[in-house]
Structures are given as structure tokens and as C-alpha cells.
From Swiss-Prot:
This is Deoxyribose-phosphate aldolase. GO terms for cellular component: cytoplasm. GO terms for biological process: 2-deoxyribose 1-phosphate catabolic process; carbohydrate catabolic process; deoxyribonucleotide catabolic process. It catalyses: 2-deoxy-D-ribose 5-phosphate = D-glyceraldehyde 3-phosphate + acetaldehyde. Its EC number is 4.1.2.4. NCBIfam families: deoC. Belongs to the DeoC/FbaB aldolase family. DeoC type 1 subfamily. Catalyzes a reversible aldol reaction between acetaldehyde and D-glyceraldehyde 3-phosphate to generate 2-deoxy-D-ribose 5-phosphate. It is found in: Cytoplasm. It comes from Rhodospirillum rubrum (strain ATCC 11170 / ATH 1.1.1 / DSM 467 / LMG 4362 / NCIMB 8255 / S1).
Length: 238
């Protein structure tokens, strides 16, 4: 799906699961499916369950005491809400149990060169997050490399905890090249989340090899099943 990486890390199913935000952002996802998603996350040890804001109270209740994080998107998927709306949305999801917030930047402002507006938008949401982690979605497929790097720098300056490649709703997803650029830009100061189009074990491992510290995926079960099969095959091979 993306540029090959020569050497992939050797991660077992449990190790790989710990990188993954088990993601369900379809607008037609109902309560039963969301609840099952939470059960899967607990069973496999995924890092968090990532859902739309309206589902956060259910997810927080289902995951209470499990150690699995509760992640909400805001300003999603276009990032085109006024800052005050993003702040209200962030405050609401945190009040209802979100431990992580994935926001979309003001993409138009970034492309217009209005860096201060982008930084202020992120900083305001960060303040509303309190102790919750903030991941900033830069929507890399809509940006050139200079804009990608700028978005990462502004996120760091605004106090974000992670930068994230994609919403998965803009026609492009994570690439190893973009992840590597983002990692070079933020260094070790921030996490880097690869999301959008990560569907296989090798996809996930390429992202991690390029510098990702978190993976967003809806194909999480298939990814860890492949990792488990690869590990079993290696142990049982001749």
C-alpha cells in the first residue's frame, strides 16, 4: 500500500496490538457494534477505542477499569469548525470520559499560510483537553511537504502530544514517507500516529519502522491475526 521499508520490526500480536487505536468512525455504527468493538479491544489489548463523540459515554462505560483508552475525534473530518466549537466538543468528550482527543487542524488556514490561526486553534483545544492526550490530524494527503512540516511544528508549539497523518476521509491515508517526515520534524518530543489505509500487519510494521508510535486502524483484528500467524509460523517452521 505504501513505500516499502527494508527492515520491518519483529513484533508479535500482543506487542503490535499495544500500538493500535481500534477505530470505528462510520456514521452508521450503532450501540451494539460499538460495544462489541470495546470487547475486542479488551480481548486483544489495543491501546484505545476511537469513535465519534456521540459514542464516548458508551465507550467510557464499557472500558472503565480495563486500561484501554477512550479516544474521540473532534472537528472531524474536515477541521472546518470554528475554534469555539472544537473547544466545546473537546470539553464535552473529556467530561464524558475521553482520555484521548484526535482533532483536525484548520486545513484551509494552514494552506493560506495563517500559521498563527492554526497554532491558536490547536492550543485552545489542548487547553480544553485537560489531562487527555491531544493528537493533531494534519491531513497529509492535502499538503505538500513544507506544509506537512509546518503543521507538525505548529502542533508542537501549541502543546499537542501527537501528530497524526490522516482522517481516512480525504482520499488518502498514511504513507511511510509522510510518517518519516513527521518523525523527523517533531523528533522524540511528540508521538506520531499513522492512520488511514493501514489494513495489514506489514502495513502497520512499515509505519512503525518509519517512526510511528501509534497506529489508527479499523482492520485491527486482521492485523493482529496476521501477526499471530506469523509468530506461530516462525516458531513452528522447519
Amino acid at each position: 500500500m505504501t513505500e516499502p521499508t527494508n527492515t520491518l520490526p519483529n513484533l508479535g500480536a500482543a506487542e503490535l496490538a499495544a500500538y493500535i487505536d481500534h477505530t470505528l468512525l462510520r456514521p452508521d455504527a450503532g450501540a451494539a457494534e460499538i460495544a462489541a468493538w470495546c470487547d475486542e479491544a479488551v480481548t486483544h489489548g489495543f491501546k484505545s477505542v476511537c469513535v465519534n463523540p456521540i459514542q464516548i459515554p458508551l465507550v467510557a462505560a464499557k472500558l472503565a477499569g480495563t486500561g484501554v483508552g477512550v479516544c474521540s475525534v473532534i472537528g472531524f473530518p474536515f477541521g472546518a469548525s470554528p475554534t469555539a466549537v472544537k473547544v466545546a466538543e473537546a470539553a464535552w468528550v473529556v467530561a464524558h470520559g475521553a482520555t484521548e482527543v484526535d482533532m483536525v487542524i484548520d486545513i484551509g488556514a494552514l494552506k493560506d499560510g495563517r500559521a498563527e490561526a492554526v497554532r491558536d486553534d490547536i492550543a485552545a483545544v489542548k487547553a480544553a483537553c485537560g489531562k487527555a492526550l491531544l493528537k493533531v490530524i494534519i491531513e497529509a494527503c492535502l499538503l505538500d511537504d513544507e506544509q506537512k512540516a509546518l503543521a507538525c511544528r505548529l502542533s508542537a508549539e501549541a502543546g499537542a502530544d501527537f501528530v497524526k497523518t490522516s482522517t481516512g476521509f480525504a482520499g488518502g491515508g498514511a504513507t511511510a514517507k509522510d510518517v518519516a517526515l513527521m518523525r523527523r520534524t517533531v523528533g522524540s518530543a511528540l508521538g506520531v500516529k499513522a492512520s488511514g489505509g493501514v489494513r495489514t500487519r506489514d502495513d502497520a510494521l512499515r509505519m512503525i519502522a518509519a517512526g510511528a508510535s501509534r497506529i489508527g486502524a479499523s482492520a485491527s483484528i486482521a492485523i493482529v491475526a496476521e501477526a499471530d500467524a506469523a509468530s506461530t509460523g516462525a516458531k513452528g517452521g522447519y
